[in-house]
Each structure stands twice: as C-alpha cells, then as structure tokens.
Amino acid sequence: MSALEELITKAKALQAEGHTPGQISDELGLSMETVTWLLTQQKGMEAPKDVHIDWAAVGSHGVLLNDMAMMMLKRFLYLEEGGDVRAIEDLPDTVVGIAPSGAPLATLIAAEEGLKLAVYLPAKHSRSEAPTGSLSGTFSAIAAQRCIIVDDVVTTGTTLSETIAFLRQHGATPVAVWSLFDKRGAREIDGVPVHSLFVISRLG
C-alpha cells in the first residue's frame, strides 16, 4: 500500500469513527482541502499539494513530547532572529494551547515556567450548524492576559487567525505563535510573530 493509499484509508477510518473533517485534518496534519480530497477523491483527480507530517513517535511518548515542548521554549528565548537572548521575564502570562495537539505542548511549557494555561477549541471541531471556536472553561481565563499560542502544525494559518481574533475579542493580547512545524513559511499571522522549530518547504 502506498503512502497516499494509507492516508486515504486512515482518513476514511476516522470518518467512520465519527470524526469531523476538521478533526481528521488535525489528526493527520493536513489541510481541510486535502482531507476533503482524501474522503471524496475519484480516480484521475489530482491530489492537492500538501505535506503529511507524522510525529506520532514523539507525541505518543511523554518524555519525548516534553523534550519538544522545551525546544519550543528555547527557540523563543535563545534563537531570536535579531541575535538577542530573551529573559524568562519576557514570557507572557498565559500559554494557550490549540486543541487537540497544541494542548499537551502548552501544558508542558506552562508547567515549566509557572504560567497560566488556557485551551482553545477551534470552530472546525464544532458539530453545530453555525460552528464557532471557544475557550475551555476548565482552564484559565484570558481577559487582560498576554498570551502565547501553541499548536503543532501551521498548515494554512486559518485556525491560528481564528484563535488570534478570539483572544483579541475577549480582551487578551496574543504576542507570539509557537509551532513544531510550519508548512506555510509564515513569519507572522495577523500581526503576531510565528516561531516554529521546523519550516517545511516544497520545491518546484
């Protein structure tokens, strides 16, 4: 079975389990456009230009996941493009993890630095007729907080734009986006700087 056939099989299996296209997009690290194609593709149709990132070997192991979270933290503190090293005091008040994959990373970062933790539930996970994003009531409020947004993969930037807008509408100030992988090559999204560990580029 080819890699593409495996993705089609995985996408259809997740759909059969009741996952929404948005949830499948997060599970497979693919754009919504690609997921739609995987679920509906017909022979002869050209696949969207996308890159599948499978980091389950790291995400499924607590110690390795913590290592990745600490790399994200150090990327922000010690590898600033201008050459300056940030102080721990420069960290904002709250770490906002985008569910599902950004939440465990955000938890580890918040625990390491003694910061507040919030979890954002994006609109694409909602099953309502008019889907909207929301903040989990179990974790920190964000009003008047300076926030870092954490996610695993930047694909199109749509979910991050949604999160940034939500935070601003609710009185918070998003100061940075941290991600493991950036498939868009974004330096900023809606005026918020993006700090990624790895940037994925297609040639040609």
From Swiss-Prot:
Residue ranges that the Swiss-Prot or TrEMBL entry lists as coiled coil: none
Which UniProt keywords are listed? DNA-binding, Transcription, Transcription regulation
One GO biological process from the UniProt record?
A: regulation of gene expression
GO MF terms held by the record? DNA binding; orotate phosphoribosyltransferase activity
Gene3D superfamilies documented for this protein: 3.40.50.2020
Keyword Transcription annotated: yes
Task: Give the comment on domains.
Answer: Contains an N-terminal DNA-binding winged helix-turn-helix domain and a C-terminal regulatory domain (or effector binding domain) resembling phosphoribosyltransferase (PRT) domain.
Family according to the record: Belongs to the purine/pyrimidine phosphoribosyltransferase family. GfcR subfamily.
The record ties this protein, via PANTHER family, to: OROTATE PHOSPHORIBOSYLTRANSFERASE, PYRE-LIKE PROTEIN
HAMAP family given in the database record: GfcR
Q: What is this protein called?
A: Transcriptional regulator GfcR
- Please tell me the species this chain comes from: Methanoculleus marisnigri (strain ATCC 35101 / DSM 1498 / JR1)
Q: Which gene name belongs to this protein?
A: gfcR
